C-alpha cells in the first residue's frame, strides 16, 4: 500500500512543418511494505517497513513534417529523456532477527530515440483527424541494472550482507506505435496511442491518452 504524488508540465512549438517540445515531471511516493518470512522450526513472522521514493523526468524532442504525396506526411523525429529515481534506505521491523536493513539506492537512466512517423490529415466537422503509424529505435545509457545492498539486522558485523542485482535494461530496443490525434480547433487536441518496445529479452506494450491546450 502507498501514496504517490505526480506533477508535470509540457511546453511545445508547432510550426507549419517543424515541431518541438520540452517536458518534465516530479514524483514522490510513500509505500508501506509487508512481507512474511519463515526460518526453520519457527512460526511465520511479518516484516514491515516504510519506503520513501522520489523521481524526476525531463526531456525534449524535435521533428519535421514532409509531405510525400497522396495526402500522406512523413515526419522524422529525435528526442532524449533523462530519468532519475532515488529510494531512501530503510530498516524493517517485526521479524527479528530476519529484519532487513536496505541501503539507499539511486538510479539514473538516459535514453535517446529516433523515429519515423507516417500520418494523414483529414478535415472533420471544422477540425482535423490525424491517424498515424510510427517506428524507430531507442538507445539507453546509465544505470541499466538496479543494485540493492542489504543485510540481516540480526547478523553481527558484515555477516549477513548481500547484494541483489536486477535484470538490466536492454541497451537498444525497437519501437512500434499507432494512434490518432483529433483537433476540434487550433487550440485543443485529444488523442490516443498504443506502442510496443521490442528487444532480445523483453517486450513492453503501453496504451496512452492525452489532451493538450495550446496558448
What are the language-model segments listed below?
Residues 1-215:
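Membrane translocator/pore-forming domains, dominated by Gram-negative outer-membrane beta-barrels
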Amino acid at each position: 500500500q502507498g501514496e504517490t504524488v505526480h506533477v508535470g508540465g509540457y511546453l511545445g512549438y508547432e510550426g507549419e512543418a517543424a515541431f518541438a517540445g520540452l517536458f518534465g515531471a516530479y514524483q514522490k511516493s510513500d509505500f508501506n511494505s509487508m512481507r512474511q518470512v519463515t526460518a526453520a522450526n519457527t512460526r511465520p513472522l511479518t516484516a514491515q517497513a516504510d519506503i520513501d521514493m522520489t523521481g524526476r523526468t525531463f526531456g525534449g524532442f524535435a521533428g519535421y513534417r514532409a509531405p510525400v504525396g497522396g495526402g500522406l506526411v512523413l515526419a522524422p523525429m529525435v528526442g532524449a529523456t533523462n530519468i532519475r529515481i532515488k529510494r531512501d534506505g530503510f530498516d524493517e521491523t517485526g521479524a527479528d532477527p530476519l529484519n532487513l536493513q536496505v541501503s539507499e539506492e539511486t538510479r539514473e537512466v538516459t535514453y535517446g530515440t529516433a523515429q519515423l512517423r507516417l500520418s494523414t490529415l483529414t478535415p472533420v466537422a471544422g477540425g482535423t483527424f490525424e491517424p498515424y503509424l510510427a517506428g524507430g529505435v531507442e538507445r539507453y545509457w546509465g544505470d541499466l541494472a538496479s543494485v540493492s545492498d542489504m543485510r540481516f539486522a540480526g547478523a553481527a558485523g558484515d555477516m549477513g550482507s548481500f547484494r541483489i542485482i536486477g535484470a538490466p535494461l536492454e541497451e537498444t530496443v525497437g519501437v512500434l506505435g499507432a494512434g490518432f490525434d483529433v483537433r476540434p480547433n487550433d487550440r485543443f487536441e485529444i488523442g490516443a496511442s498504443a506502442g510496443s518496445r521490442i528487444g532480445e529479452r523483453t517486450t513492453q506494450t503501453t496504451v496512452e491518452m492525452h489532451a493538450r491546450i495550446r496558448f
